[in-house]
Structure formats: structure tokens, C-alpha cells
């Protein structure tokens, strides 16, 4: 059954249209330079995600937002997300890498859903998201569907 779900998720990623991919890549290009803002929005939306990062666990989010460590880690996360966006629709390798690094950390489906919600909230506040919402929905459904099938 898990194999069937995984196959359907791969099909979903492959089913993204060229217009959807272009829309997602274009809208993300406008914000990917604000890695700190993106990670801040995600941590603010779900503090349990921040707690998974030992260097940030238990610290006041507003006080660490301007630190070099926070910036470096935000750039790493957003850089990987940029790679995924750039690789669309061929993201199987990215998903495998993501799952391999996040499963041992005990990341839950709920936390990933909350990461998604925080990211979407950020996008709504910083882009013309209404025009890209359907494309983002399809893209995030495909990515997280593949991740959940492998976790």
C-alpha cells in the first residue's frame, strides 16, 4: 500500500504543468533572498519546529532572529528549498535527501504541515500570492505527499 501511495505522489509531482512550475519559481524568486524572514515566519507559526534545532531551542525567537547563526541556518534551509523549486518536477532525489535527514530528527507530519502553513503565511504577506496560490498548492501537495509517503 505504501508503494502505491508513493507511486501516486511521484505521479502528482510529474503532473505539475509548465505554467504551475513557472509560477512557483517566479514567485519564490522574489522572496528567496529573505531566508531569515521565511525561517522566522515558520518558527513563529510553530515553536515546536524551532525546538527541533538545538542551537535555537529554548531561545527567544526575536532575540536570535538577527544572529549570524540564525541567518546561516535560514540560508541553508531556504537554499535547499530553492534547489527543490529549481528541480521541479523532478524532485525525487530532493525528497529522498530531505527524508533521510529529517526522519532521524523525529520530525513529525504535523510539524511539516505547520512548516507548510508558516511558509504559506509568509508568501501571502510578501508576494502576490492570490495569483500563485493554486500552483503553490499543487507543488506543496506533491512535495509533502512524497515526503509523507517515505516517512
Curated annotation (Swiss-Prot):
Which N-terminal residues, if any, form the signal peptide?
1-15
Family annotation (Gene3D superfamilies): Globins
Assigned protein family: Belongs to the globin family.
Native organism: Chironomus thummi thummi
User: Additional comments on file?
Assistant: There are at least 12 different components in Midge globin.
Q: Which gene encodes it?
A: D
Pfam families attached to this UniProt entry: Globin
Give yes or no: UniProt keyword Lipid biosynthesis: no
Binding partners and assembly: Monomer.
Binding of heme b: at which residues? 102
Q: What is this protein called?
A: Globin CTT-IV
- CDD domains attached to this UniProt entry: Mb-like
Q: Supply the InterPro entries for this chain.
A: Erythrocruorin, Globin, Globin-like_sf, Globin/Proto, Mb-like_M
